[in-house]
Regions:
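Structured binding/interaction patches within domain cores
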Residues: 1-153
Length: 153
């Protein structure tokens, strides 16, 4: 399993040598999400969201909406609304960023179930869709991600 601090340190060292290239950041975010997704389970991520969260009501609402959507109790639009509320909780503090990453990974499981990734698509397609959706909600995400990496250096 990958250690988040080791990954962040490696990225920070590279950034110091390469002028904080935004394209590099997005690629590193993609690689990080892929590793995080592959090395965790949906249940594990759900537990992390509960354990490391100051905004339990909004997170719980999102997690319940996710489960209810798959039980056909709510619409996809309702699920998306709850997801967006949870994503908007993001701040660039270390604790906030880790919480945000857990929400993103949990969303990847949702996207996979929603079959948003095209038939025959792979995890890279799934991550690309999430990064685009995140950018719509947080246009400054690359800058905030960069700031987080610098703080961890």
């Amino acid at each position: 399993m990958y250690d988040i601090n080791e990954i962040m340190n490696n990225i920070s060292e590279f950034l110091e040598k390469n002028q904080k290239n935004k394209i590099f950041l997005i690629n590193k975010l993609r690689d990080f999400l892929k590793k995080f997704y592959e090395n965790n389970s949906q249940i594990n991520i759900k537990e992390k969201i509960f354990l490391n969260n100051k905004n339990t009501d909004i997170s719980l609402s999102f997690l319940l909406a996710s489960e209810n959507y798959y039980n056909s109790s709510i619409s996809l639009n309702s699920l998306i609304s709850k997801r967006v509320q949870a994503w908007k909780l993001f701040d660039s503090s270390s604790e906030g960023f880790r919480f945000f990453l857990n929400l993103i990974i949990y969303t990847m499981y949702d996207y996979e179930k929603e079959e948003i990734a095209k038939e025959g698509g792979d995890i890279d397609d799934l991550i690309s869709i999430i990064i685009i959706d995140l950018h719509d909600i947080h246009p400054s995400l690359p800058t905030q991600f960069e700031e987080f990496l610098i703080q961890q250096a």
